[in-house]
Amino acid sequence: MDQFLLDELAASVAKRPAYWDRDFSSHEAYVKSVEPNRKRLAHILGLRDARTVFDGLQLDGTTATSSLVGQTDRITIHAVSWPAFRDVTGTGLLLEPRGRDVVANVVAIPDSGQIPEQIAGLSLGLTPELQYARRLAESGCRVVVPMLIDRQEKITRLTRREFLYRSAFELGRQLVGYEIQKTLAVVDWYKKSWPAKPVGVIGWGEGGLITQYAAAVDTRIDAACVSGYFDSRQNIWQEPIDRNVFGLLEQFGDAELVSLIAPRPFIVDAARGPEATIPGGRGAPSRVVTPALGSVKEELARAERLIEKLEPRAKLRLVEGGQKPLTGQALGQFLKSLAADTALGQAGENNITHLRKKFDAAPRHAAQFHEIDRHTQWLLRESPFVRKQFYKPDTSSVAKFEASNEKYRTQFYDDVIGRFDRKRLPLNARSRKIYDTEKWVGHEVVLDVFPNVIAYGILLLPRDLKADEKRPVVVCQHGLEGRPQDIIQDDHRAYHDFAAKLAERGFITFSPQNLYIFTDRFRTLQRKANPLKKTLFSVIIPQHQQIVDWLKTLSYVDKERIAFYGLSYGGKTAMRVPPVVTDYCLSICSADFNEWVDKNASTRNPHSYVNSGEYEIFEWDLGSTFNYAEMAGLIAPRPFMVERGHYDGVASDETVGWEFAKVRFLYQGKLKLKDRCEIEWFDGPHTINGKGTYDFLHRHLNWPKR
């Protein structure tokens, strides 16, 4: 499986041209021709919130402190903030030249491990030659330096960036998208106030990431310079998870982003970048490394090949030969791309004195952190209304409902789960007997699915199965870190051998092995899949389709009576596989059904995943599309059941009831299906109860009780 995804990642580069239709007849035609790709990039970056229009930056001072935090005979530096979107602001510094005209307007973005004061010369950490915001201001530029959220750990062993990324991702937003919006809000102000003045964006490390994306999505930016970041993105799954962009590599690597910036000047400073190792804990293990020079050159050469037909040629520049980021050569080229007649001034010798003697950056960072969290939580509260506008099947009749539901099924598979565009392999079934009991016989089964991908499970056949008899099948699914064997023997506290007990009742059962096993090993699969616009279920669904197709070839299986029953992560499977594998005639979700979007995005809900170690669990933009009620809608009109223990820590009873009420209303209120949707509440924990669900199976699979 790992090799399959690595192969898909490698193949993604060659598949990208299919998404582009570049017109090289003129610069204007070219820019217009790549606009659909630009819009797609903005969408996957989560740039959906309307930015606030404003007339000027706010000078951040009080009766006790001035907004003026530093000045020399060449520049002034003010603490500033500005509206970005809704109630979210940007904050940082404004540097302006003294005694001369402004030649260009610039946004200079530090790495997330830096504070604005460092690149402005107000704080320790950088020598004057590396204080690129200061040097640009001293050379005649007006410069705004925004603050980024840092990557320090919270007390929960989770970085601040990952914490904010998690809930935003579930709601179709990105932390990097929020920071791009803050940058573009400054660009809005620049263009509104000085429409004829050139605008440039420059950044190092994480600031380079924001620079590159901002320049790619906004053509008003006249030039961009990226230092310590530009590289092949094929190993993005090893980078911090807050850089994870769902579907990025489907259309975009860094070379393709450059092709969106073209024909505008783009400078790559192949200098040392930030370096860090994030061990994980509750968060995703990752690393930040300096891009290798060879890789940088190769990716830039690929960009040049993508736009080689563009005339006049795009102005791409590579600066190499130095480890120090954004020093003379790179900074000089960036300045000349904005103001050709302006030379970069010499670096000063000393830092600038900070006029706030007891300056502490921590309160500013905390305020920005909580603003972003509050905005995302507001999106969460609004999301039920967004989904209600999104999911509108025709419920005037069951037939019309089924027909109108197909477009949502397609969207769910293509845009939420992610569909691999490849044919499944022939079944090539292999089996061996591994159980021989008084009431049933068990066989291990292996099926081919894709290259380097198999489906594996255990088939249990009741001993009283007669020749020429066709019986119903229940596909029984284990949970997180589980095995098929766990639901067959040894009376596991959660499973209680439910696959074996159903076989004792006369059902044929099949217990597949799903991918969610071996902790970071399977979570890394999700990380490799996401940039391809795929998920773990992009593989699990074809595996289940192959299983169902194989079951249908067995002479003793009734093709119309194949049911699904899963617990915990298997219940998560019950909500995602039957909507797509419609061969399943019913679905039972045990110990998982809840208000899933809230569980993934809430920073208040005590049951939330936001502070958990399950960093793979978050799914792109479910908040705007499919919560569990909508997923159940894709199962309808087939029978659907929830098994819920009062003391199951997955969620509270009231949360489960809230979401289930929507499903019940669809089945019984709108579609008038009185007997196909139910929930069993029982006095117990996270476990198979095996009472109401067994009755449900007997009734809907038309199999007598024993």
Kindly label every feature range from the protein language model:
Residues 1-90, 172, 178, 184, ...:
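Alpha/beta-hydrolase-fold serine-hydrolase catalytic core, especially in secreted/extracellular enzymes
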Residues 95, 109-110, 146, 202-212, ...:
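Generic beta-strand/beta-sheet core signal
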Residues 101-193, 198, 204, 229-243, ...:
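Cap/lid segment of the alpha/beta-hydrolase catalytic domain
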Residues 103-104, 139-142, 196-198, 219-223, ...:
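Loop/turn elements at helix/coil->beta-strand transitions in domains of secreted/extracellular proteins
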Residues 119-127, 163-181, 201-202, 212, ...:
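Alpha-helix capping and helix-loop boundary segments enriched in small/acidic/polar residues
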Residues 134, 212-213, 259, 399, ...:
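Alpha-helical segments flanking ligand/cofactor-binding loops in enzyme cores
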Residues 150-151, 275, 516-517, 565, ...:
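Conserved beta-strand edge residues that scaffold enzyme active sites
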Residues 186-260, 549-622:
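Primarily recognizes the serine-hydrolase "nucleophile elbow" in alpha/beta-hydrolase
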